[in-house]
């Protein structure tokens, strides 16, 4: 007797099965077979599983399970990232919520880091717990945290090697600076937001009594103004930064300013003289064609300053207030160079000192002001001087920190950098030579653009949590780099009497993440490398990740892995789109549209969902709006769908597009799919009680041959879709086979054989039912592991299969069944399906009760179809509840009947006693209209010369055949309509 539950309830078996898999060690690498390695992009330890994680992890798990079933030695390397900034923010917020008065600063570095480790121990396994619920089949014993001793040793080794190779240096450059966090941040952590602002035009007086003839023209080239001016007009969106200007620039070929190339201007409010320089960067058509240059507070201006050797005047403190130069640079108030020296001839030390000296020219009333208060004062004083020419609205791209929401400041500070040019050149070669493949390939263009426009990488962060930079300074300011202080002292002969202090900065998290492909395999420790399979599992097979981190992570892994190991990190890079909500909006806490994958799996009440979406908002005022929208969208909360339904939904949505809209309605549909599979399995089990088969079926019926041929085709499609990372097509193909071919058709077509007195046909049909179902479960397993395992365990004893789990059962292969002689059976069953569909449509439209038997009349111009009808008479009668089947001669009068056409065959159901004649006339009129529409479509294509000339001949022939078929159907329908 079958022990399968009567209804599909994923909560009754999913967690149980995962615990069994893990306990049995099914996910541990086998050390046999060809290696197949997948790298999990390590999620932040601060976070929880969101839809983006679930999306990518489902696809990764499907790949791993698929290859494991094909005999590969699979390693799915998982772990978490220490997430420096995010973790510090979370722990600081938790300290505030505890109400003990403890803060990051009051605890000090060591105390705060101890708190971070406490928090990490309590919450660090959240992601792994959620991944298990999703069904990820990874070897958790190899899970790695980027702050573990092994990867930490790899970070130190990488830093020291690159430093010794001259690739890492310490210097003063512009970085993205968050004035709230008081640290540099990466470009990925900056969001450029379009906002309304202003463009202010300011007169900059020319120095030394210089004047020029200013001429303006209209769009047609007509002169509209000519006057002598002793000033230039400069437009800016950040007037407060003019206090740090060290030049104004014009285009070298701008005729308006040719006489001013050696001039100077008097910088308003400071009285400093700064040069007029020429640079191709200037857009002559924008504004007046005169641009202020503030190298310390604008990334483009910084590049100009580097080209022209301009001094850099840093205006701001770390929290974006105007500096007090006497505190910041106490030794640089007096000039230190000959007053007559050309600024273009300054060396780097002189240039830096000059910038610090020029900061003393900042007027005293500005010192200590917040940047926006300084802006107000600058504008007020410019107005008082009557040199604020114009103020007009202007759209701005404002850089804001993605965590604090604050405007990010281009900030001049001492940081550690990696020289990127040589690394990037090599990284581009590895991709363009084909050693690394991008899927879809168009993302190579994005990769190429970034690599060809690369800048040196700022790797230091002003945080406490993270990998501390392995550099020590003595009291004289000399820097020494090494793996630890003892090595530094020994290497440089520094005795105990020389005080050393380690750099207080930490490395940004991308520095450790770039080492992920090989630090997780034990590098650089030779014993750990041997134990963890460095030589076997590097390069990994595929990286599945989003396009938003191609440069920040993918490119850096390529460059670092090549630099440190001489290998590529992975063979394929499968770039996924980004998950958005059903309206195409980005999912975010602030929008209140985030879906927790576990809520889709296990369900959640509306009250809990509202609480989850509104608690802890950065903008509490949004809570009411979010609650209202949530209650409208999910009035009853979210029902439990189970992990398999979510996974199949994700696969079905995984197109190669840039954006992927997640529709919860799709998950409901795929829950129904799992339910249908469950019910079909119950049918098979109930009809094969006591059966025991081995080997491949020897089919005796056309229906068996047809389904086995379809199985072979869907198997081929499955392998092709995995190879091309087309999970959407994979899901579609498997869905069509499972739902339509197997459940809707073969199960129905099997019923006549199962109820037939031909015991051999019944036995072979039972064998084929079990065989195809078992194969289907294996095909589906990588996408829907739980339901397939639960069903498979019930099916396989009847097939003599003793493998403990479907996870390790061989994946179906093309040719498992020899279907080479099944073409006729395939055609016959497709004909039978057409017959059944046509008659069922007639019965439905006539509202004939399912249990009522009807008479079927058949009519054709030839006798060709009579043998086939005879062969399938029992199936037709069984499936269509036919009282009898009779033939009419061609041209013979027919009684009033409901008609359908299948090929050359007219199907007639006499209406006497069945239906209202008026209703049948309406039905025929409707069917005639439908067929006319199909004929119109065919004629439209065949009447299009471009289609006929350019489409493959087989496609054109198919269209002509369709036209002939529809035309035949129309004639038959019109004939029947005429009789009514």
Swiss-Prot record:
Motif ('KMSKS' region): 586-590
Swiss-Prot/TrEMBL GO biological process terms: valyl-tRNA aminoacylation
GO molecular function list: aminoacyl-tRNA deacylase activity; ATP binding; valine-tRNA ligase activity
Major place of residence: cytoplasm
Family annotation (InterPro entries): aa-tRNA-synth_I_CS, aa-tRNA-synth_Ia, Anticodon_Ia_Val, M/V/L/I-tRNA-synth_anticd-bd, Rossmann-like_a/b/a_fold, tRNA-bd_arm, tRNAsynth_Ia_anticodon-bd, Val-tRNA_synth_C_sf
GO CC term (a single one): cytosol
The keyword Coiled coil is annotated on this UniProt entry: yes
Catalytic reaction equation(s): tRNA(Val) + L-valine + ATP = L-valyl-tRNA(Val) + AMP + diphosphate
SUPFAM superfamilies found in the cross-reference section: Anticodon-binding domain of a subclass of class I aminoacyl-tRNA synthetases, Nucleotidylyl transferase, tRNA-binding arm, ValRS/IleRS/LeuRS editing domain
Chain ranges for the short sequence motif 'HIGH' region as given in the UniProt record: 43-53
EC number from the UniProt entry: 6.1.1.9
Keywords, in A-Z order: Aminoacyl-tRNA synthetase, ATP-binding, Coiled coil, Cytoplasm, Ligase, Nucleotide-binding, Protein biosynthesis
Subcellular location: Cytoplasm
Coiled coil: 914-980
Superkingdom as given in the UniProt entry: Bacteria
Residues the entry annotates as binding ATP: 589
Free-text domain note: ValRS has two distinct active sites: one for aminoacylation and one for editing. The misactivated threonine is translocated from the active site to the editing site. The C-terminal coiled-coil domain is crucial for aminoacylation activity.
Function comment: Catalyzes the attachment of valine to tRNA(Val). As ValRS can inadvertently accommodate and process structurally similar amino acids such as threonine, to avoid such errors, it has a 'posttransfer' editing activity that hydrolyzes mischarged Thr-tRNA(Val) in a tRNA-dependent manner.
Name of the protein in question: Valine--tRNA ligase
Organism: Xanthomonas oryzae pv. oryzae (strain MAFF 311018)
Classification of source organism: Bacteria, Pseudomonadati, Pseudomonadota, Gammaproteobacteria, Lysobacterales
Protein's gene: valS
């Amino acid at each position: 007797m079958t022990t399968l539950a009567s209804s599909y309830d994923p909560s009754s078996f999913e967690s149980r099965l995962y615990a069994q898999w893990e306990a049995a060690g099914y996910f541990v690498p086998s050390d046999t077979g060809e290696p197949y390695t997948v790298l999990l992009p390590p999620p932040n330890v601060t976070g929880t599983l969101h839809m983006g994680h679930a999306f990518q992890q489902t696809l990764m798990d499907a790949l791993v399970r698929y290859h494991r079933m094909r005999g590969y030695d699979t390693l799915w390397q998982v772990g978490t990232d220490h997430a420096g900034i995010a973790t510090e923010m979370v722990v600081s917020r938790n300290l505030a919520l505890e109400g003990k008065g403890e803060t990051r600063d009051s605890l000090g570095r060591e105390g705060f880091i101890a708190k971070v480790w406490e928090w990490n121990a309590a919450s660090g396994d959240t992601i792994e717990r959620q991944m298990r619920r999703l069904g990820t089949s990874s070897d958790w014993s190899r899970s790695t945290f980027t702050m573990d001793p092994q990867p930490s040793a790899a970070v130190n080794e990488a830093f020291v090697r690159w430093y010794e190779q001259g690739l890492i240096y310490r210097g003063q450059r512009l970085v993205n600076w968050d004035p709230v966090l008081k640290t540099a941040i990466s470009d990925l952590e900056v969001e450029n937001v379009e906002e309304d602002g202003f463009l202010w035009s300011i007169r900059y007086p020319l120095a030394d009594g210089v004047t020029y003839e200013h001429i303006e023209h209209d769009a047609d080239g007509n002169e509209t103004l000519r006057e002598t001016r002793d000033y230039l007009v400069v437009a800016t969106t950040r007037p407060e930064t003019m206090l740090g200007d060290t030049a104004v620039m014009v285009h070298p070929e701008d005729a308006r300013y040719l006489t001013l190339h050696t001039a100077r201007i008097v910088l308003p409010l400071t009285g400093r003289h700064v040069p007029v320089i020429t640079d191709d960067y200037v857009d002559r058509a924008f504004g007046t064609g005169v641009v202020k240059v503030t190298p310390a507070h604008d990334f483009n201006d910084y590049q100009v300053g580097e080209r022209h050797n301009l001094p850099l005047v840093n205006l701001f403190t770390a929290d974006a207030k105007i500096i007090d130069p006497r505190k910041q640079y106490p030794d640089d108030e007096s000039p230190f160079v000959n007053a007559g020296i050309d600024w273009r001839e300054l060396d780097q030390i002189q240039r830096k000192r000059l910038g610090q000296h020029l900061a003393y020219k900042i007027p005293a009333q500005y010192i200590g002001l917040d940047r926006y208060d300084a802006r107000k004062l600058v504008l007020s004083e410019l107005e008082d001087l009557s040199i604020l020419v114009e103020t007009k609205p202007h759209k701005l791209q404002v850089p804001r920190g993605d965590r604090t929401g604050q405007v990010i400041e281009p900030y001049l500070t001492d940081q550690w950098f990696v020289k990127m040019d040589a690394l990037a050149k090599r990284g581009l070669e590895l991709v363009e030579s084909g050693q690394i493949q991008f899927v879809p390939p168009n993302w190579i263009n994005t990769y190429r653009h970034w690599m060809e426009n690369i800048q040196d990488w700022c790797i230091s962060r002003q945080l406490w949590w993270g990998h501390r930079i392995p550099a020590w300074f003595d009291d004289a300011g000399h820097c020494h780099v090494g793996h630890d202080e003892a090595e530094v002292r020994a290497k440089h002969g520094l005795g105990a009497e020389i005080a050393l202090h380690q750099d207080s900065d930490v490395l940004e998290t991308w520095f450790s993440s770039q080492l992920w492909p090989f630090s997780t395999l034990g590098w650089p420790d030779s014993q750990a490398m041997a134990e963890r399979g460095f030589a076997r599992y590097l390069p990994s097979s595929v990286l599945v990740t989003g396009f938003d981190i191609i440069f920040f992570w993918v490119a850096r892994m390529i460059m670092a892995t090549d630099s440190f190991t001489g290998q590529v990190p992975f063979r394929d890079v499968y770039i996924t789109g980004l998950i958005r909500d059903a309206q195409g909006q980005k999912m975010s806490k602030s929008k209140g549209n985030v879906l927790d994958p576990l809520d889709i799996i296990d369900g959640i009440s509306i009250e809990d969902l509202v609480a989850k979406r509104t608690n802890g908002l950065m903008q509490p005022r949004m809570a009411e709006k979010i609650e209202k929208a949530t209650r409208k969208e999910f009035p009853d909360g979210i029902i439990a769908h189970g992990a398999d339904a979510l996974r199949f939904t994700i696969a079905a949505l995984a197109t190669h597009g840039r954006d992927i809209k997640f529709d919860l309605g799709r998950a409901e549909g795929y829950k129904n799919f799992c339910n249908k599979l469950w019910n079909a399995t119950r049918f098979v089990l109930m009809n094969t009680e006591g059966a025991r088969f081995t080997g491949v079926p020897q089919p005796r019926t056309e229906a068996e041959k047809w389904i086995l041929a379809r199985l072979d085709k869907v198997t081929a499609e499955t392998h092709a879709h995995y190879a091309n990372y087309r999970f959407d097509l994979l899901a579609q193909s498997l869905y069509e086979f499972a739902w339509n071919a197997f459940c809707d058709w073969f199960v129905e077509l099997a019923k006549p054989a199962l109820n037939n007195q031909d015991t051999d046909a019944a036995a072979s049909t039972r064998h084929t039912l079990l065989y195809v179902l078992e194969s289907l479960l294996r095909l589906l397993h990588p996408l829907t592991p739980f339901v397939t395992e639960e069903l498979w365990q019930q099916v396989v004893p009847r097939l003599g299969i003793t493998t403990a789990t479907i996870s390790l059962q061989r994946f179906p292969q093309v040719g498992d069944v020899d279907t080479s002689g099944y073409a006729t059976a395939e055609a016959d069953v497709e004909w039978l399906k057409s017959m059944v569909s046509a008659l069922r449509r007639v019965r439905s439209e006539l509202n004939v009760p399912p249990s009522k038997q009807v008479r079927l009349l058949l009519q054709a111009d030839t006798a060709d179809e009579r043998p086939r009808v005879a062969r399938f008479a029992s199936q037709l009668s069984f499936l269509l509840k036919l009282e009898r089947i009779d033939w009419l001669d061609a041209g013979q009068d027919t009684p009033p009947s409901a008609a359908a056409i299948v090929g050359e065959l007219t199907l007639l159901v006499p209406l006497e006693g069945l239906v209202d004649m008026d209703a049948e006339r309406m039905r025929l009129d409707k069917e005639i209209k439908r067929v006319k529409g199909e004929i119109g479509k065919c004629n439209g294509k065949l009447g299009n010369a471009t289609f006929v000339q350019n489409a493959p001949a087989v496609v054109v022939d198919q269209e002509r055949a369709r036209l002939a078929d529809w035309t035949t159907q129309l004639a038959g329908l019109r004939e029947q309509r005429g009789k009514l």
